[in-house]
């Protein structure tokens, strides 16, 4: 590594550390547990939006369940490839984790057209058929219908993911889909309301 590369890396780290210091100061007192706060401050860092202090909701076992799943080499099922692109695949692969999105698969597209469904719904159904949901981390940042279908698969077809990250953004069904997840016993991390998006899921 050249000196310039080392300096750029150090500069980037200093900028990030400075950003987190600003977040910690401006956020002030909060009721998040330490592990939860690490998530919330990264969401604020990605969005520059302190409203997420009020929007982020955690199941009591969310952090420990997510960490345990990663250490066990879980599947990470995402609704859009943008989330997959933002994850550190090398680091996850070192734990044995695999990142998967079925939303662009030909059979998923065909089924969505045939059933007048959505690709997001059919992608989650495919993941369940293939046995990929049990013990998985499911990260939904774009498609509320994927989140709604995940809840149905849990309630009606005994899917048992380790953690649901439910942060779809939008005006139609986004807020409602998150409320459905909040009613589950399955560990979850949710950004309630309309706000969200793939950068938050990452």
Report each predicted region and the residues it spans:
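Charged, compositionally biased N-terminal leader segments and the immediate start
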Residues: 1-34
């Amino acid at each position: 590594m050249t000196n310039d590369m080392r300096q750029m890396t150090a500069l980037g780290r200093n900028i990030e550390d400075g950003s987190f210091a600003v977040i910690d100061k401006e956020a002030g007192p909060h009721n998040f547990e330490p592990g939860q706060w690490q998530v919330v401050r990264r969401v604020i860092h990605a969005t520059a939006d302190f409203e997420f202090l009020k929007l982020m909701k955690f199941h009591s076992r969310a952090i420990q369940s997510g960490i345990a799943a990663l250490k066990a080499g879980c599947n990470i099922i995402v609704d859009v490839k943008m989330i997959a692109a933002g994850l550190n695949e090398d680091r996850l692969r070192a734990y044995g984790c695999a990142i998967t999105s079925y939303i662009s698969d030909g059979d998923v597209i065909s089924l969505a057209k045939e059933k007048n469904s959505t690709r997001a719904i059919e992608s989650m159904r495919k993941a369940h058929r293939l046995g990929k949901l049990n013990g998985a981390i499911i990260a939904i940042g774009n498609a509320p219908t994927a989140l709604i279908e995940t809840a149905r698969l849990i309630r009606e077809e005994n899917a048992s993911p380790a953690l649901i990250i439910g942060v779809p953004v939008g005006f139609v069904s986004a807020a409602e889909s998150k409320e459905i997840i909040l009613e589950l016993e399955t560990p979850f991390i949710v950004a309630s309301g309309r706000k969200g998006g793939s950068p938050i899921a990452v």
